[in-house]
């Protein structure tokens, strides 16, 4: 049985943090065992943030894959962290990489990749990709399942 006494958000009413910096990513222990590493995927198809110049909303489909070592990111804390971007002004690239770096800092995974598939503003979709290095040998990495933007196509 996993000790959940250190978790402050799971099972509790928690207000959405005012900013990503104020959000707390909590972790739970993970026993990865022998053999190829497990890959954990989080998909956030309705991610939102704000343009830092105009204040207009930006929307993205975010896919996060990581190979945990000794810790998993607790999913409610991740949800609150992701939601905290709704009032955060930053460029697409900064948001995407910030998310990846925060998860790496919290969990210290064997490997992580993040894809931010941003919906067009001004007619240009922006896709942002970041990873910590080469994927672990033997890991099963399915396609992200996000089709390239096609417009009217």
Curated annotation (Swiss-Prot):
GO BP of this protein: queuosine biosynthetic process; tRNA modification
Classification via InterPro entries: GTP-CH-I_C/QueF, NADPH_dep_7-cyano-7-deazaG_red, QueF, QueF_type1
EC number of this enzyme: 1.7.1.13
GO molecular function: preQ1 synthase activity
Compartments (UniProt record): Cytoplasm
Protein residues bound to substrate: 73-75, 92-93
Keywords per UniProt: Cytoplasm, NADP, Oxidoreductase, Queuosine biosynthesis
Catalytic residues identified in the record: 51, 58
Enzyme class label: oxidoreductase
Disulfide feature: none
Pfam family, one: QueF
Pathway(s) this gene product operates in, as recorded in its UniProt entry: tRNA modification; tRNA-queuosine biosynthesis
One GO CC term, this protein: cytoplasm
Catalytic activities: 7-aminomethyl-7-carbaguanine + 2 NADP(+) = 7-cyano-7-deazaguanine + 2 NADPH + 3 H(+)
Superkingdom, taxonomy of origin: Bacteria
Annotated function: Catalyzes the NADPH-dependent reduction of 7-cyano-7-deazaguanine (preQ0) to 7-aminomethyl-7-deazaguanine (preQ1).
PANTHER family on file: NADPH-DEPENDENT 7-CYANO-7-DEAZAGUANINE REDUCTASE
HAMAP family cross-referenced by the UniProt entry: QueF_type1 (MF_00818)
Family label: Belongs to the GTP cyclohydrolase I family. QueF type 1 subfamily.
NCBIfam families named in the record: QueF-II
Name of the protein this chain belongs to: NADPH-dependent 7-cyano-7-deazaguanine reductase
Species of provenance: Mesorhizobium japonicum (strain LMG 29417 / CECT 9101 / MAFF 303099) (Mesorhizobium loti (strain MAFF 303099))
Lineage: Bacteria, Pseudomonadati, Pseudomonadota, Alphaproteobacteria, Hyphomicrobiales
